[in-house]
Amino acid sequence: MFNLGIITISDKASRGQRADRSGPLIKESLAGQDCRVVGYEVIPDEAALIAERLKHWADSGDMDIILTTGGTGLAPRDVTPEATLSIIDKEVPGLPEMMRTSSFSATPNAMLSRAVAGVRKGCLIVNLPGSPKAVAECLEVIMPVLAHAVDVIKGRVTEHPAPGG
């Protein structure tokens, strides 16, 4: 069982001008998984605020994983990757690489994603896209490895058996 936080990053949703559909979709998609959502926020596309929330949640020790949604594209206010990179201790490039690779079969626009993933103080942070459809696709890709990632980060797994045995 791992604890999860969800941060939706959207100017319009944070001002109440649009409903957040991606954050609730993440919650729904994880129902029945071996995790518990312990935090959920909607904040604007402000790099300093994003970095502060990520630091606060990761440093609290209450969350094993933080999933962000939104702010990973090319628009001028899309700053989630920069905010994430500014606070992580190490990158985990395989997660966003596989999300982009998998999503590319649905849309070539996946190449434009700048999502990143990394670890800060024992907490895995993963940027997801903002579109509900893209969120669902990316969650399907990363869900099978999240529990193992948490176990490795927490030091509960020290040896990895060779494939096939």
Task: Name these PLM-found stretches.
Residues 1-165:
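Non-catalytic beta/alpha edge segments that cap or flank active sites
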